[in-house]
Amino acid sequence: MSPTGSPATPALRHRTVLLDEAVEALVWRPDGVYVDGTFGRGGHSRAVLARLGPDGALVAFDKDPAAIAEAGTIQDARFSIEHESFAAMGERLAGRGHVAGVLLDLGISSPQIDEAARGFSFRFEGPLDMRMDTTRGITAAEWLAQAEEQDIARVIRDYGEERFAVQIAKAIVARRREPGDGGPLATTADLAALVAKAVKTREKGQDPATRTFQALRIHINQELEDLERGLKAAYDLLQVGGRLVVISFHSLEDRIVKRFMAAHARPQQDADPALRRAPLRAADLPQPTLRLLGRVKPGAQEVADNPRARSAVMRVAEKLAPAASGRGAAPA
């Protein structure tokens, strides 16, 4: 998928990032049950199905009704899809036992960015919606029309890492009080113009609205909360030897993924001062339950072919048996 506001590609075109690398890392047994937590337009799912044998199965998840419609074009008895966030995979798959692998391709897809009516990008004028699931929840415009100034500033600061968050929040609230052509923000163009006035300096090569749009999208869709829940659910569902493959597109996502994997890849007494002081034998110490298999970034050719891939980072881990020994070395 992709970060918000990247350079536009032809309308509604989508190129799956790290396609071969992700599927190679994920599928280790052709008769396993796998989860594609972010179906999108089905690039990874179709490639996974091509690798599975007749006894394999793939369960996909997606919030976006357009993705669910696209999934309907896959006529394969081994495939099913849930119109739900991947954060709910634990509940949805509770009766299916353990799975052989889980893939999460985070962020936003090119069709979502390039469809003006979705309101994800400042490059196209449209309603300020930003919902992944257009059938539920409030839009970005609705939230900005009612949120407290300090809450708006916090979201833009924490999720956009925007140093002008306070100024932007003040401008948004002031705009709500304006008569005539003022009032609450309604379109992507409204928000982009307001941010451009509030941000006093420009980062080279980046539109001043980039961080604000990212922050609002993350907040409206609860992306980081879903990621934390989804990682735990995936870990609990994985069988021994199962693979967790996560592709992230910005530092907030990657930081959560890296910390989650690292926490399970080192003996757990590292985080418990009492255990560190206890005179335990090595055999008595908590053992790692994930082995880190690497960190992959797109090659130069993929980035040249698909500029939206440039910020992608893929991390891979393998579930270990509870009594497994050894320490996974976390890549940088």
Curated annotation (Swiss-Prot):
Q: Does the entry feature the keyword Cytoplasm, yes or no?
A: yes
Alphabetized UniProt keyword annotations: Cytoplasm, Methyltransferase, rRNA processing, S-adenosyl-L-methionine, Transferase
One GO molecular-function entry = rRNA (cytosine-N4-)-methyltransferase activity
- Assigned EC number: 2.1.1.199
What PANTHER family does this protein map onto? 12S RRNA N4-METHYLCYTIDINE METHYLTRANSFERASE (PTHR11265:SF0), S-ADENOSYL-METHYLTRANSFERASE MRAW (PTHR11265)
Function noted in UniProt? Specifically methylates the N4 position of cytidine in position 1402 (C1402) of 16S rRNA.
Which protein are we looking at? Ribosomal RNA small subunit methyltransferase H
Organism from which the protein derives: Cupriavidus pinatubonensis (strain JMP 134 / LMG 1197) (Cupriavidus necator (strain JMP 134))
List the gene name. rsmH
